[in-house]
Amino acid sequence: MMIGFIAIVVVVVMWYVGTMNKLRAAALKVDEADSGIDVALTKRYDVLTKQLAVVKEYASHESKTLYETIRLRQGMSMKEKSDVAEKMNEVASQLHITMESYPELKASDNFMALQSSITDVEEHLQAARRLYNANVTSYNTKIVMFPASIVANVLGMTKRELFEAEEYKKQDVEMKF
């Protein structure tokens, strides 16, 4: 009887440790994907800043301030990162409108290279968002499914938020000047 009890305890402990390790691995994947979004946003900011410099070289005047400096910091919530991404979308839209006013700018090799870079950066950012959301969904599913939810509760694991656009950001943008 004692051997049976010890065997049950060993099985339960092994299950607990295995489940704990799986949940922690899922949390690490979410953190890694979160870092991927930070990298993509930083790269996007750098490319937009370079494009703005090229536009300013060709423009004889500035009608508006086209961007505000956005500092990406560790520990931003997904909502804050989403807001930063939206501000960068506005900057990109304004840059494209400004570019239309200067046809010679569109022919610039530097500008064309930057346009290509922006496309690459946008694709990378979208991929980072998809990876993050996939990892968050997997993690959130694991921590609420019984019996793993018991271990998740003991470890204090909580649901993570998805990176998603707010309703008004899903609609077409109307530019007014």
Regions found by a protein language model. Name each.
Residues M1-F177:
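A helix-centric hydrophobic-segment signal that preferentially recognizes long
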